[in-house]
């Protein structure tokens, strides 16, 4: 199947993000170049590396939103990380290689989901057979075994995570007929609310050390989990819920995880995307203090990952040679040239995002799919309230957001969310208790609710 063209990718991004056409085009071209590269002979493919992108622009103009929407658009492993979460090797915190391990996990999740779809029909049939046996159990018979057989069975049972069983099941003709009847009812969906007791793998317990281990890039729980047997617990659930759990277990039995891991590593290495946000926060404007030195250390740790290296993951080695890296930052107190020269050179495509104008705010309020206004209209619809905004009111909201941004810290489109929350506070509070029918938000109402905020600079500071 042909990949989405750059124009199609930009059109999809336009549904959610206003303006910033240069950034959208750069991202779209970089993504489509992956498809172009895949059509070339292997000896040529090896020499074509992704052209990494550095996006710079004020906060709240769409850098992170572009990354978030990309994850929905592209059929490729995608992870978003924050540069500020990493620490230099030798310090407590996440090491930079953890972003590659996160990408490997995401690739496995995607491929696993695809493989589950292929065996879903078979898994459902097997789960239904199990449900029939549980709903109409056979006659239990005691097994008399010598001590050696009992010991062997106990060891096997413990390794499997279950308990000891000295019983076998005998199916009589009557039970067989009952099972046929139950199977027919299951197929017709007549037993969905019947309760059944099933054995499922016990969910892993929360580990208080887990967060610390995760910060240091160590996945001890998963490493130990693969070695130790899975413990099973009994749960009584409606048939509809029990089937979902049984189908999940059957799918895991039917797929080949060695193939999944191999495909996932290949996909992550050839088409993976890592978005590094807040990269401006690790620039070392002042190299004389220890904080500046530490930040430069993080940059130097990121450098070999972006240049191309091999990182060990629990699924196998993963090469970063052909992973696309997109970095973004506001660069309010620094500039891209404050990054170490070697790292600058690894992001050859530079895109500057524009600050938002009043007209941009108007479009952000109305145009995107599930825009802010559409979200509030849908929320109040749940209370039977029809919320309507006049064109003049929308224009005034945008004007106030722009003025507040100009008068205080410019936080871009994020300003709209807090202004709308302040504007609709009374409606949201009274909505569930009043039969209000249709409420129209006019320019006069907006001015009444928000004019004090614009005039009073002390109040403006609290509209974050």
Curated annotation (Swiss-Prot):
Recorded GO cellular component terms are:
HslUV protease complex
**Main localization, broad class:** cytoplasm
Q: What is the lineage of its organism?
A: Bacteria, Bacillati, Bacillota, Bacilli, Lactobacillales
Say which species the protein is native to: Lactobacillus leichmannii
Per the UniProt entry, the disulfide pairs are none
Put simply, this protein is called ATP-dependent protease ATPase subunit HslU
Q: Which GO terms describe its biological process?
A: protein unfolding; proteolysis involved in protein catabolic process
Cited InterPro entries:
AAA+_ATPase, ATP-dep_Clp_protease_ClpX, ATPase_AAA_core, Clp_ATPase_C, HslU, P-loop_NTPase
Family, as annotated:
Belongs to the ClpX chaperone family. HslU subfamily.
